[in-house]
Amino acid sequence: MKFTLSWLKQFLDTSASVTEIAESLTAIGLEVEEIIDKAADLQKFEVAYIVSTKPHPSADKLKICEVETKNGNLQIVCGASNARAGIKVVLANIGVEIPNGKFKIKESNIRGEKSCGMLCSEEELFLASESEGIIELPEDAVVGEPFTKYYGLDDPVFVINVTPNRGDALSVYGIARDLSAKGIGTLKELEIPAVKSTFSSKVKLNIKDKEACPLFTFREIRNLKNKPSPDWLQKLLKNIGVKPISSIVDVTNYMSYSFGQPMHAYDADKIGGGIVVDRHCEENVIPRLDCGISGEESVIQDPVVKPRDDNRGFHALNDKKYLLNKSDLVIKDENGVQALAGIIGGISSSCDSNTMNILLEAACFNAKMVAASGRRLQIDTDSRYRFERNIDRNFTEKALNIATDLILSICDGGEVSEILISGEKEPAKKTLDFPAGYLEKITGIKLTILLHNEANKGEFVGNTEHSIAAYKEVREDASTGLTPKLPLEASYVKGLNIKGIEAILNKLGFATDTEKDVIKITPPSWRHDINILEDVVEEITRIYGYDKIESIKLPELEQDNNRLREHKRISSFKRILASKGYDEVVTNSFMNSKDAKLFTELKDELFLLNPISVEDNYMRPTIVPNLLDIVRKNLARSIKDMAFFEVGPNFIGLNTEATYLTAILTGSYNSKNPHSIGRSYDIFDLKSDLETVFDYAGLSIEKCIVSNQATPLYYHPTRSVNLALGKNLLGHFGQIHPKILKHYDIKEEVFAFELNITNLPAPKAKFGKRDEFIISDYQANFRDYAFIIARDQPVGEIISYINNFNKKLVKSVILFDIYSGDKLPSGKKSIAIRVGLQADDRTLNEDDLNSFSKDLIANIEQKFQGTLRE
């Protein structure tokens, strides 16, 4: 939206500076994108006077002009057809840069004649897209002064960004109203002229689609002199980039920018029959309308059917042709379509310099239809821009009277008909009950309460922090005497009072009526975006000033160290597994109950009452089935080597869940190559990765209780274990049961671990802190032991025991063989273990090693009934 300072002052009595106006506009939500001051940009171009001209001796189209300037007369060669003696023109002296082309004027020789400057056109100064000659200035222009003063360029142009909900701000009058409410001047009272009709129009009006066109008004004006519009009007339009055409067209453009009401003028002599507003039809069925006094109902006689000519289309004012369809709303007569409603007029009924009689239209069209047609046909006009943001239907008839009065005054009078109207005005807006305390509730702006003291007729100042309830009690007790506690001038410092709220809303056009502590608010007809109390709060706040809202420090949130610690730990686990080659996935927390039944006993409380789909009707008891489903999909795409993990909740019961780190592994550890036969992943690869996670958490699998009793049924019964720390179950790891894999159509071995992060103990030291790593300078020694133990004895317990047997000496324990066969007693197995021994303070001698072996063998025999194999 563009407008000039002088245009604004037509409706706003203000002495505010350009800067103050711009700051206020931005503060009330009408962001100023740019202020164009062409006077500053073109101040070096001055007024000059052509004393005489003579033909150029070597060029027919050039003239040699003697030009009077402030520094004396100059000779300038000019090719403009309108260059002649006796006119004031715009001069660019030597050294001045021309905007269009960015070149500097130099003294030159043109076809043998000296030229000491340049006489400028509008096009060369970027004042118009094209021009036919040099600029001619008024006769009273003073030679040597900047030409901008006489061309109307000393009028700054505001360019503002209007949000889609503020169609009322697409008018200078609407902007003036907002600035007046902000306190930047006083809104001038708008005088609506009373235009008396001198004849009755015989043009009939028929609105076929009331929803598409809720209001259509027009009047006929005869015997006009369609001369160029006056300088003041041309300057306003030129400054905002609108090309002046003629008095009639310029007035319609002026009305659109001044009041936000698009208008259109038809050459009445080019209109046949009557006016019909309807959706475009496949075959142009144009009714021949009878003549007579217009009314709501029109008599349609003898329809004239004209076949549609797709090659011709609708010829618009932009000299382009458009093919219309049934969704387009058109204005037509018996000759065909004369305008695309709300968007653009047709060239066949356009006004020109010979136009004397017009039909002047002011209407309201459906915003969605206008927007849809404009988008489809790719036509952008000021009219469309306003209609698709809704206009004030209650102002349409007033706008028609203002425009009529302007046209009559500019075109030296004429004859006017009565206004022909079809449709209704905007119905009254819904009244909103606005509680006095609602403003503070939403924005924090404290409401100042003014109480009358009957004793001294003064005012008591209170705030909502003293509560409106207290105010009610005081007001209802007529006998209460109040002494002012704050000076009277402080009453408007801390906040608004109810009267202040009403004043703001009234200046914005809202009707208000206060009953006790509730303001009954009726939005004006031009505010289509005011529907709820929050909309009213926004209006009050933007005018009152966002900068006046008191800054309140947010309360400091207490940091939950446990949650923070868990979050850091989870992040570390993710990085560890990612470094091991795992990919993180995030899957749905819901699953099919049929699949869930394979993994756990179903619980009624975990069924979803309103599932997204029948396939996802159960809360997952474990993440494993989701990961298996990913494995199945990848195998179907010939991707065989996979390592995935996910951190997420497992749902145990109603309001009971635990966060699990779940990983799955399948495929080859390394593929076959010239240097290796390759091998597949096994359970020990998974165990190694789990040990790394445990190690970073400050734990050790060796310290856990390892048991293969009661592992989940979806694990292989003899190739899986539970991990516990005391009574806390930390998780499971092992090979997935073949029956489960068969259900998922997976033929490869799959290994998984599940770690219950919720049950992991907090590390005693700072998370991630390692003990100092010390390398002994003394000789390491290794001893191999073969023990015969019970077949069902877990080997891990023995390894864990040896690791903790003598921490000062034992550096490593490695299982390198397990044997069970006929050479051993029934129910027995043999294990071979290599123990690494090293002291930090000395070299171990034979006595030290023998003593260690003797004690270890004795303790293994006592604790595990294991005997040393000979």
UniProtKB/Swiss-Prot annotation:
One BP annotation, GO:
phenylalanyl-tRNA aminoacylation
List the record's Gene Ontology CC terms alphabetically. Answer: phenylalanine-tRNA ligase complex
Domain RPE1 insert, which positions?
Answer: 450-498
SMART domains, A to Z: B3_4, B5, FDX-ACB
Q: Where is the B5 domain?
A: 427-551
Question: Where does the protein end up?
Answer: Cytoplasm
**Cofactor(s) listed in the protein's UniProt record:** Mg(2+)
Limits of the FDX-ACB domain: 776-869
What are the protein's UniProt keywords? Answer: Aminoacyl-tRNA synthetase, ATP-binding, Cytoplasm, Ligase, Magnesium, Metal-binding, Nucleotide-binding, Protein biosynthesis, RNA-binding, tRNA-binding
Write the Enzyme Commission number(s) for this entry: 6.1.1.20
Q: Which family does it belong to?
A: Belongs to the phenylalanyl-tRNA synthetase beta subunit family. Type 1 subfamily.
Task: Relate the assembly described in the record.
Answer: Tetramer of two alpha and two beta subunits.
Instruction: Report what the protein is called.
Output: Phenylalanine--tRNA ligase beta subunit
